[in-house]
Amino acid sequence: MPRKIILDCDPGIDDAVAIFLAHGNPEIELLAITTVVGNQSLEKVTQNARLVADVAGIVGVPVAAGCTKPLVRGVRNASHIHGETGMGNVSYPPEFKTKLDGRHAVQLIIDLIMSHEPKTITLVPTGGLTNIAMAVRLEPRIVDRVKEVVLMGGGYHTGNASPVAEFNVFIDPEAAHIVFNESWNVTMVGLDLTHQALATPAVQKRVREVGTKPAAFMLQILDFYTKVYEKEHDTYGKVHDPCAVAYVIDPTVMTTERVPVDIELNGALTTGMTVVDFRYPRPKNCRTQVAVKLDFDKFWCLVIDALERIGDPQ
């Protein structure tokens, strides 16, 4: 039985890879793509979601735009990583085949969760958590109906938006605090894991060998991404967001530890930090777990297989 997910994202180059993976893997039933301000403005990330849906040949999956700004803070973006469009240097068609759902993303999330059987939908946020927090506040009953939240965000060893805070949590820590403190199960796929998901030359060669238009698109954005990382960070591109989707497909793609997690909201130097408590004894009723180690080969095999299954959509 395919796992039903709602992918709440801010495309974003690595979000695009996550969309390809979710669409191309038969173990996933992609119920919706919802967008939130993050890597770029809401307008730009929504445009990018429609572009990627067109490239991947996604039909019949609603795409809806969500929150334009965090719950209480100002807007920050990551144009220095993803470019001014949020999707590197790709070109855009005069119009998109993929039409926007008329509902706000938060309402679409609520509608889908409330209309499906309880514990059948996994939320996969790969951007800031504003939409998810808003959905919880508008319709608290969704918490008991969601199977799990598997998010890309946070980190227990290092940050990227600050020395200790990861970007997705940093841009809306109040939303993250809401999501992590609800009574649902949360798997945090953070920087400690995603920094292992490198788009190495060997990986890019495998993408090129797929030989389809979606593969060429992915190669183009990964090339842009890698050049930015090589210049700014002296490393290969770190493909964060598809790691969360990969976990839903096959949890053995990474190892996790069940530990308490909370969000720092008031620190002079630590706002947005995901505070992970590895001390023993561990709480028996702990609802949060953090990803630790990635099976690199298994992860990239999932991505390449999804690309091959997508083929060349008409």
From Swiss-Prot:
E.C. number: 3.2.2.2, 3.2.2.3
Catalysis performed (reactions): inosine + H2O = hypoxanthine + D-ribose; uridine + H2O = D-ribose + uracil
**Superkingdom of this entry's organism?**
Eukaryota
Q: Which GO terms describe its biological process?
A: nucleotide metabolic process; purine-containing compound salvage
List ligand-binding residues for substrate: 14, 160, 166, 168
Q: Which pathway or pathways does this protein act in?
A: Purine metabolism; purine nucleoside salvage
Regulation of this protein's activity per its record? Is potently inhibited by immucillin A and immucillin ACAP, which are transition state inhibitors.
The cofactor named in the record is: Ca(2+)
Q: Which residues bind Ca(2+)?
A: 10, 15, 126, 241
Active site per the UniProt annotation: 240
InterPro entries, alphabetized: I/U_nuclsd_hydro_CS (IPR015910), Inosine/uridine_hydrolase_dom (IPR001910), IUNH (IPR023186), Ribo_hydro-like (IPR036452)
The Swiss-Prot or TrEMBL record annotates one GO molecular function as:
uridine nucleosidase activity
For this protein, the record's Pfam families field holds: IU_nuc_hydro
Gene3D superfamilies, per the entry: Ribonucleoside hydrolase-like
- Record's keyword terms, sorted: Calcium, Glycosidase, Hydrolase, Metal-binding, Nucleotide metabolism
Family stated for the protein in its record: Belongs to the IUNH family.
State the oligomer form and interacting partners.
Homotetramer.
Which PANTHER family does UniProt cross-reference here? Answer: INOSINE-URIDINE PREFERRING NUCLEOSIDE HYDROLASE, URIDINE NUCLEOSIDASE
**Function field:** Catalyzes the hydrolysis of the N-glycosidic bond of all of the commonly occurring purine and pyrimidine nucleosides into ribose and the associated base, but has a preference for inosine and uridine as substrates. Likely functions in purine salvage from the host, a fundamental pathway since protozoan parasites such as L.major are incapable of de novo purine biosynthesis.
Q: What is this protein called?
A: Inosine-uridine preferring nucleoside hydrolase
Organism ancestry: Eukaryota, Discoba, Euglenozoa, Kinetoplastea, Metakinetoplastina
Task: Identify the gene encoding this protein.
Answer: NSNH
